[in-house]
Amino acid sequence: MKKRLVILAALFATVCLAGCKGEEEQAPQIVTSEPSIQVINDTPAISIEQEEEADDGSHEGMYRSELTNEWIPEELKDQRPIAAMVDNEKTALPHYGVSQADVVYEMTNSLANDGITRLMVLVKDYEKIDQLGSIRSTRPTNLVIAPEWNAIVCHDGGPFYIDDYLAKPFVDNFSGEFSRVDNGKSREFTEYICTGDMEKLFGKSNVSKTYNEYHKEGPHFQFVSKDDEINDLSSAPGVKDCTKVELPYKHNSSKLEYDEATQRYLYSEYGQKHTDPGNNDEQLGFTNVLIQNCRYVKFDDNGYMMFHAIDYNRDGWYITQGKAIHVTWSKEDEVTPTRYFDDDDNEIVLNTGKTYIALVPDDKWSGLVVE
């Protein structure tokens, strides 16, 4: 599907000095606006349909998760996922509960400290996780992406740059009201979402626990349609072998290595395996890997920045089953899902399982290793 972009306006101006909220240091205030994008279709809109396999009765009371395509209890169908901001500084390790997340985003959180990253983890059945985190602050990029899942952002404050985004009607969030765990670390590394926290917060707020009017109907990802079906990318254009991915994140050196036995890409950082003591020390792993080349804007000299998560026809990779293909990605607005297309302009089909999505600064893209 071919489209044309018209970039109408993008304003970034320094106005005055202001402080940050919560844990963040001071930074000069600026007024920002996400580029206004008009998308003009050259071809008629194509309706996206997903073929469903016949239910033989073995999945009674279950439905396919919109996040992973796995069979999960029907009672969760209308429940909104959470998007938890997880600190990825080395001091915050080990992470708890992240290996049980459905989708994990990793993205540059600041241009300072060699481009330190932060995780945004999406979880549908959050009550199954006893302890998730540690929780840290959010950024504007997260508040642009989370609405495409109709997810509730769980964080602890953030710089004032997030204020205009938090005020948008399709952004719901809980901030700084989670459990504190005595782990021997300084206070900023002790906040976790623990059993009962979400129910307590829903009980004292007007935030809807179930999908609201901003939820986009239809599939978010295009998944394989049958239990035993696997997309091995064998017929995809430009397919190449890929058993190793090295992200150009200098601070933590994120890496994914393909494990043929489990057919997953296992995640490491800081030169060590990422294991989860909250889940029997399981190593974080993914069936699907998506990598996005992203433009960004630098807000100030303190390293605050924002990715252009709303953009069109940007480069990327889809990686699964020991193979990789070049893709292009597009996102039209906050509540519309990001779409990924192969080089024949077909929307990609993901395999059933967890997905890792990395946003890589365009000026670091050449340092990405996919081999």
Residue spans for each PLM region:
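C-terminal motif of bacterial Sec signal peptides marking the signal peptidase cleavage site
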Residues: 16-19
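Bacterial signal peptide processing site
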Residues: 21-23
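A surface/extracellular/periplasmic glyco- and lipid-processing/surface-interacting theme
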Residues: 25-40, 44-105, 112-371
